[in-house]
Design a protein with these regions (language model features):
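Long, aromatic- and glycine/proline-rich binding clefts that accommodate carbohydrate-like moieties
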Residues: 348-398, 405
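Hinge/lid segment of periplasmic solute-binding proteins
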Residues: 100-153, 209, 296-297, 364-367
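Extracytoplasmic/periplasmic solute-binding protein
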Residues: 140-149, 154, 179-231, 274
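Extracytoplasmic "Venus flytrap"/periplasmic binding protein-like
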Residues: 57, 61-129, 165-167, 268, ...
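Glycine-centered hinge/linker elements that transmit conformational signals in sensory
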Residues: 183-187, 228-258
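A structural signal for short loop-to-beta-strand junctions that line the ligand-binding cleft
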Residues: 92-93, 124-163, 307-310, 382-389
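Extracytoplasmic/periplasmic substrate-binding proteins
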Residues: 42, 212-215, 243-326
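Short, low-complexity disordered leader/linker segments with a strong preference
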Residues: 1-38, 60, 422-431
Length: 431
């Protein structure tokens, strides 16, 4: 799962942004029919196991609306396969692996059904299940072209042994604010407990803000995305606080601007090079048996209560595609697959969280026996993903270039980031 977020954002660069739609937006309620449908799911072994059981249960009760399911065809990426199918007009009805970053391109191709206008209960079902998190997946027209499905909320992992070696409380570490983290970093460095404190991917790749700035900014800003209302947001007071925090980490040698020689995502923490790490619940698989770790919410400038701390969701969603003949069955299957029982089964089978506001209640017994996952559960309703915007690749790369020059480098932070915001605003205006 370590490259999950990066793969989702990478999708944006590989997809053809068609100048004209190759299909309608699927908003005609009068055209809704029922019957057999086809779906795709990811090649992840655990997700396949979950999907097969859900499909089997559905088919047993709906012989006239049979669901045929298969893994996304092999290729360069699942996004490439979906885009090619949209162009050819032969997509399945549903894809249970739709990356939020790819939705603008799929929508521009005319491949996605407008769920808000096509189904009478579209808005009610999605917002009723996912709450305010659904708003982060809305397209610029305000409608939903994807069903929020599952999330991997990012939190801050800490190495208990390294904190103890630095004379810090390893069981209840003080890491709520930026100043707390910087104070801990000073102690860790002075004690020689770790080479670095935080060591996120350091290269200039446009996906890397998802592993340093963006999760921290979401936490500090109350869930504000990089772009909102047609403008870049990161030069706000909250954005500058986060940028200055990271600049201090690099300036003091608490973080490294050199690319890590191993796994850039999980490696520094798993290998004992960094005392802190940023990851979702997938991090446990990389850290178990290697690090004696704990997990806390991401810090903010002033300190934010855990139940109010937003974070990056690293989500994958479900798209309903316009070439589907039996859209009503597809929609009914979506709702069935995301009922409480099937959402619980998703968590139990894959370790990934359904994006539902009551996940802690639905999975109470399971989470009671899995304390690490229970820690992440409270963050699920507070997850936010990348903004649904055109030119997303260029926008994120513009931000990353400015980051490298001013946060990791020596350029003036205010003028460099202000210039990047102006460039991003121009890219947004291009549409």
């Amino acid at each position: 799962m370590k490259r999950y977020a990066a793969a989702a954002l990478v999708a944006a660069v590989a997809l053809p942004l068609m100048a004209c739609s190759t299909g309608d937006q699927g908003g005609d309620k009068s055209a809704l029919t029922s019957g057999p449908i086809k779906i795709w799911y990811s090649t992840n072994e655990q997700e396949i196991a979950w999907a097969e059981k859900v499909v089997e249960a559905w088919n047993a009760d709906h012989p006239d609306e049979k669901v045929t399911a298969e893994a996304i065809p092999a290729g360069k990426s699942s996004e490439d396969a979906i885009s090619a199918a949209i162009t050819a007009g032969n997509t399945p009805c549903l894809v249970y692996n739709t990356a939020p970053a790819a939705v603008p391109a799929f929508q521009k191709q005319g491949g996605l059904v407008d769920l808000s206008t096509t189904f009478a209960d579209g808005e009610d079902f999605i917002t009723g299940r996912s709450g305010g998190a659904a708003d982060g997946f809305r397209s610029p027209d305000g409608d939903l072209y994807q069903v929020p499905w599952k999330a991997n909320p990012f939190m801050l992992y800490y190495n208990k042994d390294m904190l103890a070696a630095a004379g810090l409380d390893a069981d209840n570490p003080k890491l709520e604010t930026y100043d707390d983290v910087l104070a801990a970093a000073k102690a860790i460095k002075a004690a020689g407990a770790a080479d670095y404190v935080l060591y996120p991917p350091a290269s200039g790749d446009y996906t890397n803000p998802l592993f340093d700035f963006y999760p921290f900014y979401l936490a500090n800003s109350g869930g504000t995305q990089l772009v909102a209302d047609g403008k870049a947001t990161f030069t706000s007071a909250e954005g500058v606080e986060t940028l200055e925090f990271w600049k201090t980490l690099y300036a003091e040698g608490y973080s490294s601007a050199e690319a890590y020689s191993g796994d850039a995502w999980a490696g520094p923490f798993a290998d004992g090079v960094a005392a802190l790490g940023i990851a979702g619940p997938w991090g446990a698989g990389a850290f178990d048996g290697k690090v004696n770790y704990g997990v806390v919410p991401l810090p903010t400038a002033a300190g934010t209560a855990p139940e109010e701390t937003y974070t990056f969701g690293d989500s994958k969603n479900v798209g309903l595609y316009t070439s589907c003949e039996n859209k009503q069955t597809a929609w009914d299957f979506v709702k069935f697959s995301m009922n409480a029982d099937n959402d619980l089964a998703l968590l139990e089978t894959t370790g990934q969280f359904p994006i539902r506001t009551d996940v802690a209640e639905v999975a109470a017994d399971y989470l009671a026996s899995n304390p690490l996952l229970a820690t992440f559960a409270s963050s699920v309703p507070l997850t936010v993903d990348v903004p649904n915007i055109a030119n997303s690749t260029e926008i994120w790369q513009t931000f990353r270039d400015a980051w490298g020059a001013s946060v990791q480098g020596q350029d003036d932070l205010t003028s460099t980031m202000g210039g990047a915001a102006d460039k991003i605003d121009a890219l947004i205006a291009q549409g």
